[in-house]
Amino acid sequence: PLWSRGLGDVYKRQTMFGVTTPCVQAVTKRLEDHYDCLVFHATGTGGQSMEKLAASHLLNGVIDVSTTEVADEIAGGILSAGPTRLDVFAQLDIPYVGSCGAIDMANFGAYDTVPDKFKGRVLYKHNPNVTLMRTTADECRQIGEFIGKKLNAIKGPVRFLIPEKGFSAIDQPGHPFYDPQADQAFISALQATFKSSAKHALVRLPLHINDEAFAQALVNAWNDIALPNARSKTA
């Protein structure tokens, strides 16, 4: 059975993508003694499945590391979870910790399946069956606005952490999707859209998403909002 230590039945969910795997694994390692961590691959259906579980009140909290499905929705990739991604949390009073994992890319199948209109873009053959497309500064701006509006509507406590040094394994110096201008477009749009409050906070960190220190920051954010939330519900 699913279990937790000291908090009753707490089911914590995370989103993972290949290029954010080190982050998710590090977070899981730090929390697995206290929570049963359910990891969903952010492939469109993964995000949808997670949100169905949340809507059924089977999840008591979320660490949404990889919001990459939003990039597919905005940029026209094949792994979108649809325009309602994140909407379920507006109806649920559960802790939400999020980040912008892999929003630097949209996804397609094999290279020859990429629509012709994208053939002039920065493309990366992840493997023979997966081609990644770098999101542009304008797309990143739209992603920031999309996520910001959704975060503002969330009912429960929110901490959204931004790793300023890169959003995926291939978004760092010397790698194909390193584009500080595009990343900054996302950050600026999110900051302009997001409404900080006593319950909702945006946190910028001078780290890469796969740094151990960033994983620890996610865990700290989780503990900051999940533990008080659990105590208030059982008091």
Task: Explain the meaning of each model-derived region.
Residues 15-23, 43-45, 67-70, 102-105, ...:
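Gly/Ser/Thr-rich loops at beta-strand to alpha-helix junctions
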